[in-house]
């Protein structure tokens, strides 16, 4: 039997009906003792959903100051109000953005801090 190129095989498959192609796949699986890959992909989907559930159950959040914005002095004041930092330390934190303002805060405290910092003109993310 002559060896067919990939292009020749594709052209041969194009001429088959769906039923003939399905029969070919079944015969191919029997002869080479393989199965379709679809069940493997279906088994991987539930595993991918598990990390999303863990994120929803997260209880400790970090408030990250991404940028101070135009009102840098107001942002420094808010950082001082949210933390126990002195003026120099708060200024260094704001100048060194992106940096964490709060770490390990609960959801309510993190959202409150984010709102206060954004009201002062900062760009903030909660992780």
Curated annotation (Swiss-Prot):
The keyword Ribosomal protein applies. GO terms for molecular function: mRNA binding; structural constituent of ribosome. It comes from the Bacteria. Transmembrane segments: none annotated. Pfam families: Ribosomal_L12 (PF00542), Ribosomal_L12_N (PF16320). Gene3D superfamilies: 3.30.1390.10, Single helix bin (1.20.5.710). InterPro entries: Ribosomal_bL12, Ribosomal_bL12_C, Ribosomal_bL12_C/ClpS-like, Ribosomal_bL12_oligo, Ribosomal_bL12_oligo_N_sf. Keywords: Ribonucleoprotein, Ribosomal protein. One of its GO terms (cellular component) is cytosolic large ribosomal subunit. Homodimer. Part of the ribosomal stalk of the 50S ribosomal subunit. Forms a multimeric L10(L12)X complex, where L10 forms an elongated spine to which 2 to 4 L12 dimers bind in a sequential fashion. Binds GTP-bound translation factors. HAMAP family: Ribosomal_bL12. This is Large ribosomal subunit protein bL12. The gene is rplL.
């Amino acid at each position: 039997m002559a060896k067919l190129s990939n292009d020749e095989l594709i052209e041969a498959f194009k001429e088959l009906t769906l039923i003939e192609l399905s029969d070919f796949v079944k015969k191919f699986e029997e002869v080479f003792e393989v199965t379709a890959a679809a069940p493997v992909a279906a088994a991987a989907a539930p595993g991918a959903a598990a990390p999303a559930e863990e994120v929803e159950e997260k209880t400790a959040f970090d408030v990250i100051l991404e940028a101070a914005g135009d009102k840098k002095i107001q942002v420094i004041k808010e950082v001082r109000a949210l933390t126990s930092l002195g003026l120099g330390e708060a200024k260094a934190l704001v100048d060194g953005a992106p940096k964490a303002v709060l770490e390990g805060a609960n959801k309510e405290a993190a959202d409150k801090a984010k709102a206060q910092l954004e009201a002062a003109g900062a760009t903030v993310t909660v992780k």
